[in-house]
């Protein structure tokens, strides 16, 4: 995820890394855990199974969240899933330049925006 935030006057403004991490994590199948014990692995695996999120879905959800943040004048979201079952990786990317101007219906455009899946 790359962003270019600006304040209301067009000047640079800081965005906390934790805010961007939250956008990424809430766009995924489940939260990220740095360490899991065996009993917790089943819970996390089942949660991911019950709420599958493909890379295309993840970048769309993150783009919706970022497009609602008035500080963002530009952003790009990429997601890669290294497949464990298939012999390929899934990739998706969306750029705010693909979206309508602020004030238009961004979520509707995100449903039809071109997202690469390989």
Describe the role of every protein-language-model region.
Residues 1-118:
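N-terminal intrinsically disordered, cationic/polar leader segments
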